[in-house]
Amino acid sequence: MEQKLIRKRQDEFEAEGKEYAAYYDNEETILEERSKVPYLHFGSFDRQEWLQLSFSTRLGGVSDGYLSSLNLGWDRGEGRENVCENYRRYCESIGADHQKLVLSDQVHETTVKYVDPNFCAGANIEKKLKAVDGMLTDIPELLLATSYADCVPLFFCDPKKKIIASSHSGWKGTVAGIGEVTVHKMQEMGCTLSDIEVLIGPSICQSCYEVSGD
């Protein structure tokens, strides 16, 4: 089998008064640094004009100290207003309405839920889903916001049915098959397997990944 070598490239940029370098191991990952809040987007999904996929960095927010500066986690001991402001800034940078965010508590399981406007975070940016690691929808303008540390992001779309999904795949979710569960949920909504496109987002590499004995 022929193996294609993908060259690693480096982008240098300045943010918050500091110099940074970003490394990529593929040609589909693009760092958007023209806005106040830098973010990643991906060529394969950019070609789908009906959807937008972006991935935050830790730059461009209001958080201090080790959380500097775009902390989007609610359980890091930071004041709620800072986290909300970071969400507002990020959504503004990608041209989206923060009130249409859909947020969930992720628990490393395989629950994938269909979401509609009833689950939107609203002006106060409230998390309305509990114990959900994957979301899917066919409603335009909803922002499915899933969170990752070193876990694997899985993004799905069906260009024909205009259905999207996003799943958080830690090692437990990966072993339990959350990717397969997400695809099955899309099929239940009428998607054909061959029409579903999947993108694996940025995550920790194998050489750096450590897990406990279980």
List each language-model region with its residue ranges.
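Active-site microenvironment for binding and transforming phosphate-containing groups
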Residues: M1-D214
